[in-house]
């Protein structure tokens, strides 16, 4: 009955909105212990809301804050209980634990704060840690909850790793130093990335469009003399064409001016003169014929000067054409001479190469003949050596027989002397 009453109390608290922290592990515990655990395993909604508030809102001026309620009571898997806290690290508030007298910081948080703009991702960080022989510590469930309550990791993350501050310094130096990146430029820090992005945006907005990239201008292939000559020809032809067009335009304008000038004079004279003026002019012409003759002479001289100018302009255009043609002819002669010289040099080099090739073939043939002679001489030497050994052997045998014969003669002579 008592257990049923306890279960009824549980259901009532659950209906009221309470939250279970640690459910009872064994159903065979005593009544007193079960009643105590039942009273301590539930929190009211107000108490849970107070315990789940982030301590970032209650940080003091020094940057450190302690966890409230459940955050402050978070413990490690071990004999000692270590509370999570916020420390000031490189000008930022970072979640950390005091483990065996060492500060262990949250690796995902410091990655987001310091290394996100320097490396490609956390997998790159783990690769660097393996290369540096740094082994981060894996968080347990209580540590993950404490870090989640501090806001160091996202709510859905259930895994995390801790790293020593000294090991993070090594990792940061490895990510920013040039010695670990042979043949590559040095990596930039977080501030450099931000400043660089702002400068690039300003340059893109302020810069004007360029005709072509500098890279293409620097990487142009080297041009041969023939290509340079063709470029000169094209430029000269364009220049002569433009000069011809200018000369034609000048001649046409001059002709139009010559045709239009007397018409304008006659029209203006007709419009400005009245009847009385015409009579007076006729009288003046009658009284002074010399002045009219002189005026006519002046007009004739003006027309002659204009015609001379037109002739001089046409002659200057012809002179320009002649000079341009002379330049083109001189360039063609220079190019032909250069081509002839290069062709002669190529033929000389070809003949020299042919001579060297023939001499090389002769040397190779002589070497083959000498090798054949050497082989024959070696064969003769081996034959003579065999004969020499045979003759020497026969000579030794003959000497041995001779000695035996002499010994026999001496023995026979000694026996005869003894008999006598």
Curated annotation (Swiss-Prot):
Keyword hit for ATP-binding: no
Alphabetic keyword roster: Nucleus
InterPro entries reported for this sequence: Dachshund_domain (IPR052417), DNA-bd_dom_put_sf (IPR009061), SKI/SNO/DAC (IPR003380), Ski_DNA-bd_sf (IPR037000)
Composition bias, Low complexity: 24-41, 51-77, 297-317
Region of interest: DACHbox-N: 85-171
An example Gene Ontology CC term for this record: nucleus
Single GO MF annotation: DNA-binding transcription factor activity, RNA polymerase II-specific
Listed Polar residues bias regions: 263-273
Biological process per Gene Ontology, one example term: thermotaxis
Region (Disordered): 23-77, 242-321
Disulfide bonding pattern of the chain: none
Localization per record: Nucleus
Tissue expression remark: Expressed in AFD, AWC, ASE and ASK neurons. Expressed in the alae.
Residue spans of biased composition, Basic and acidic residues class: 242-258
Nucleus as UniProt keyword: yes
CDD domains reported in the protein's UniProt record: DHD_Dac
Function, as annotated: Transcription factor. Plays a role in the thermotactic response.
Membership in a protein family: Belongs to the DACH/dachshund family.
Protein name: Dachshund homolog dac-1
Source species: Caenorhabditis elegans
């Amino acid at each position: 009955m008592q257990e049923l009453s306890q279960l009824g109390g549980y259901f009532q608290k659950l209906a009221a909105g309470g939250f279970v922290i640690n459910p009872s592990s064994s159903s065979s515990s005593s009544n007193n212990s079960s009643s105590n655990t039942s009273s301590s395993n539930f929190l009211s909604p107000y108490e849970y809301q107070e315990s789940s508030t982030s301590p970032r809102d209650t940080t003091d001026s020094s940057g450190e804050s302690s966890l409230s309620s459940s955050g402050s009571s978070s413990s490690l898997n071990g004999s000692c209980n270590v509370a999570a806290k916020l420390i000031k690290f490189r000008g930022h508030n970072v979640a950390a634990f005091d483990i065996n007298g060492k500060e262990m910081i949250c690796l995902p948080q410091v990655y987001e704060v310091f290394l996100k703009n320097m490396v490609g991702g956390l997998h790159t960080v783990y690769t660097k840690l393996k290369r540096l022989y740094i082994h981060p510590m894996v968080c347990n469930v209580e540590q993950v909850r404490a870090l989640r309550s501090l806001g160091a990791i996202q709510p859905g993350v259930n895994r995390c790793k801790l790293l020593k501050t000294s090991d993070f310094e090594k990792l940061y130096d490895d990510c920013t130093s040039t010695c670990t990146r042979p043949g590559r430029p040095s990596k930039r820090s977080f501030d450099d990335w931000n400043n660089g992005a702002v400068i690039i945006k300003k340059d893109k907005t302020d810069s004007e469009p360029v005709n072509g990239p500098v890279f293409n201008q620097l990487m142009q292939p080297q041009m041969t003399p023939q290509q340079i000559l063709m470029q000169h020809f094209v430029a000269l032809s364009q220049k002569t064409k433009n000069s011809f067009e200018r000369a034609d335009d000048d001649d046409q304008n001059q002709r139009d001016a010559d045709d239009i000038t007397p018409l304008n004079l006659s029209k203006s004279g007709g419009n400005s003169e009245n009847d009385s003026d015409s009579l007076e002019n006729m009288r003046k012409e009658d009284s002074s014929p010399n002045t009219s003759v002189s005026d006519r002479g002046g007009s004739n001289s003006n027309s002659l000067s204009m015609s001379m100018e037109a002739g001089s302009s046409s002659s200057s255009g012809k002179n320009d054409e002649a000079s341009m043609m002379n330049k083109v002819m001189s360039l063609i002669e220079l190019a032909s001479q250069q081509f002839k010289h290069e062709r002669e040099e190529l033929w000389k080099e070809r003949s020299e190469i042919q001579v060297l090739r023939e001499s090389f073939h002769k040397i190779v043939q002589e070497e083959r003949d000498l090798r054949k002679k050497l082989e024959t001489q070696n064969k003769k030497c081996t034959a003579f050596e065999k004969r020499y050994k045979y003759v020497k052997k026969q000579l030794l045998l003959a000497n041995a027989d001779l000695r035996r014969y002499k010994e026999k003669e001496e023995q026979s002579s000694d026996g005869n002397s003894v008999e006598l």
